[in-house]
């Protein structure tokens, strides 16, 4: 009986579409297979699953966490193929097509870009933007974890992943390259809103499901209660509320606030 956010809009005459990862998806496996086994059918009028090579992409493959062989390993690929040969370029293409096909009707579009989720795959030109040797690991204060339980001190630690100082530089470079690749695809979608004359009548939200540790507190990835893991990027663009344009807020907000705000 739960009505999801997109379903609420759909029930009120909006055409609702999903592109790529919105509900939970096994990455990289479901991207490689082009499936979305945890999707919620009543939420959408149309869906697009992305099928991309992920770590199987041609190019220079790197391994930044030699002790970790799980699906969350820090594999990287400086891909020799272009933007549109990878998941987020494909997702941007599908989102752009959705906007073109539905520009004359009320719509709700959820577009899930997968980078910088591991594997850290991006065309090589995005790696070229960064100097690996100049990467700086997060500074961790002495005794930072002395006041937390041992199970937390050892959870997803640098030692568990086997990340050396030199490997850490490569990991950061690959992470930043993945972000730049994703950011470029977001820009393509926003440019399409402008080209179609939709920007001034469209609410745009950019956010994520969690933050990420990249050596902060001598730890990696998510599932921590440190701010770097729980805090998410959050940009809300409402063209007709002009007084807030370009302003940041220090007020506490949560992702659960989105539903009542938009409803």
Residue ranges and their predicted role:
Residues 1-263:
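Formylglycine-dependent sulfatase
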């Amino acid at each position: 009986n739960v009505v999801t956010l997109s379903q609420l809009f759909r029930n009120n005459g909006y055409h609702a579409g999903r592109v790529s990862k919105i509900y939970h998806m096994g990455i990289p496996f479901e991207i490689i297979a082009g499936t979305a086994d945890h999707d919620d059918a009543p939420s959408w009028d149309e869906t697009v699953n992305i099928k991309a090579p992920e770590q199987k992409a041609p190019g220079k493959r790197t391994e930044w966490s030699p002790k970790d062989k799980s699906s969350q390993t820090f594999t990287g690929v400086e891909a020799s193929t272009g933007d549109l040969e990878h998941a987020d370029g494909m997702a941007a293409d599908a989102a752009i097509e959705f906007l073109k096909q539905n520009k004359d009707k009320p719509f709700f579009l959820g577009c899930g870009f997968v980078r910088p989720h591991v594997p850290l795959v991006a065309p090589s030109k995005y790696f070229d933007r960064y100097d690996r040797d100049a990467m700086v690991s997060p500074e961790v204060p002495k005794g930072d974890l002395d006041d937390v339980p041992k199970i937390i001190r050892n959870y997803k630690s640098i030692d568990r992943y086997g990340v050396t100082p030199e490997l850490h530089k490569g990991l950061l470079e690959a992470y930043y390259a993945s972000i730049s690749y994703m950011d470029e695809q977001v820009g393509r979608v926003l440019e399409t809103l402008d080209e179609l004359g939709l920007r001034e009548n469209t609410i745009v939200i950019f956010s994520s499901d969690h933050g990420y540790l990249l050596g902060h507190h001598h730890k990696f990835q998510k599932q921590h209660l440190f701010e770097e893991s729980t805090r998410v990027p959050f940009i809300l663009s409402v063209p007709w509320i002009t007084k807030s344009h370009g302003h940041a807020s220090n007020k506490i907000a949560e992702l659960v606030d989105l539903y009542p705000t938009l409803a």
